[in-house]
From Swiss-Prot:
Keywords: Cell cycle, Cell division, Chaperone, Cytoplasm, Isomerase, Rotamase. PROSITE patterns: FKBP_PPIASE. This is Trigger factor. The keyword Nucleotide-binding does not apply. One of its GO terms (biological process) is protein transport.
Length: 432
């Protein structure tokens, strides 16, 4: 076998391979012998069919099968010999395939880029430093109390935190529009479910009152015929209810699990949950900055085939989220996923190089700790730990996450890291 490799463009390569005729014909003869042992031909016993009849009957299909095997085996021999970092599948083109002549074919393929990390010391990372305060815990307890709240009817005027029951009729230019009318409609005030100005127009009114509200539909409103239109809503306020929060007692906290018997137990449990959530959020925030820095300092080309594979993964995930199937996923435009797919391939290559260049191995103790932290969120943590330990796929996922975290740590060790005090809300609700 002889071959030549050339670069066509970017990460694309083409190899031309010549396989001696004797090699091909020998493979054909061996396959014909194998076929002859089991071939059934009228007039002959199994295994006793003459070679020339086997050749005539099965020769074409055998040569086709042998061709596929020879293309694959000789191409991958070149890949192994030349230590090619192959990306995706090759495209074969046969240039010569005739009996008694050398087989000549080409394979066009892509390779992964050679990555030489640079600029790690130029990456800037801002690391939030957060202390969970008693006030933070109080806020979480308020959320729990609101989830268990009841509602009591009141004769007082409606406020922005109340629940109201209304009839309304909406009109534009004096005409009632489709979907603009409802009776006994329950509205939780302050949640922004209605168009701007609607809830504000109810505040200050009491049950039994009838009044009008003048509003303007937003330009981005979903109904084309209402975008930007001035509207009038005739309101009948039938009921106003105020939220009644349960008292913070041992009886109340007992609803939240067998380990919460007192208010102090609940506060401790909430603190542990908040610490776990905070740790995950801080890890994600720092990792995001590290990855952004790696990409900014290391511009690399990526194989189109790898991007296409990632697009298909993202398509499938999108379809699953919305209850679709493979056929529906295939209809989603690739443009929706192309940038994200390219970024994911780039990040994967850069982190792989960090792992290789720093000779990182999975920290098994760290993996064990991660599983225990996941399990601590369940009522039977020991069972969760055992379930993970017996599930090879889950364990591999955990090890991959840990190795990726170790890679991020390796970059952080060289990056410019500054610490900045932040609140729990700053980290958990950055858009708030």
């Amino acid at each position: 076998m002889s071959f030549t490799i050339e670069t066509t463009q970017g990460l694309e390569r083409r190899v031309q391979i010549t396989v001696p005729a004797d090699t091909v014909e020998g493979a054909v003869r061996e396959e014909l012998k194998r076929v002859a042992k089991t071939a059934r031909v009228d007039g002959f016993r199994k295994g006793k069919v003459p070679p020339h009849i086997i050749e005539k009957r099965f020769g074409a299909s055998v040569r086709h099968d042998v061709l596929g095997d020879v293309l694959q085996s000789h191409f991958f021999n070149v890949v192994m010999e030349q230590k090619v970092n192959l990306a995706g599948r090759p495209a074969f083109a046969v240039e010569q395939f005739e009996a008694g002549k050398d087989l000549v074919f080409t394979a066009t393929f892509e390779v992964y880029p050679e990555v030489a990390l640079q600029g790690l010391d130029q990456i800037k990372v801002e690391k939030p430093v957060v202390e969970i305060s008693e006030a933070d815990i109080d806020k979480m307890i308020d959320v729990l109390r609101k989830q268990q709240a009841t509602w009591a009817e009141t004769a007082e005027a409606a406020s922005a935190e109340d629940r109201v029951v209304i009839d309304f009729v909406g009109s534009v230019d004096g005409e009632v529009f489709e979907g603009g009318k409802a009776e006994d409609f329950t509205l939780f005030m302050g949640q922004g479910r209605m168009i701007p100005g609607f809830e504000e127009g109810i505040v200050g009114h009491k049950a039994g009152e009838q009044f009008d509200i003048d509003v303007t539909f937003p330009e981005e409103y979903h109904a084309e015929n209402l975008k930007g239109k001035a509207a009038k809503f005739a309101i009948t306020l039938k009921k106003v209810e105020v939220m009644v929060l349960p008292e913070l007692t041992d009886e109340f906290v007992a609803k939240f699990g067998p380990n919460t018997k007192t208010v102090d137990d609940l506060r401790n449990e909430i603190r542990k949950n908040m610490q776990r959530e905070l740790k995950n959020a801080l890890t994600a925030k720092v990792k995001g900055q590290v990855i952004d820095g790696l990409l900014a300092q290391n511009a690399i080309d990526v194989p189109a085939s790898a991007v296409e594979q990632e697009i298909e993964v993202l398509r499938g995930q999108a379809a699953q989220r919305f209850g679709g199937n493979k056929e529906q996923a295939a209809q989603l435009p690739r443009e929706l996923f192309e940038e994200q797919a390219k970024r994911r391939v780039q990040v994967g290559l850069l982190l792989a190089e960090v792992i290789a260049s720093h000779e990182l191995k999975v920290d098994e103790a760290r993996a064990k700790t991660m599983i225990e932290e996941i399990a601590s969120a369940y009522e039977q943590p020991a069972e969760v730990v055992e379930y993970y330990s017996k599930n090879k796929e889950l364990m591999n996922n955990i090890r991959n996450v840990v190795l990726e975290e170790q890679a991020v740590d390796a970059v952080l060790a060289k990056a410019q890291v500054t610490e900045k005090a932040a609140s729990f809300d700053d980290v958990m609700n950055p858009q708030a």
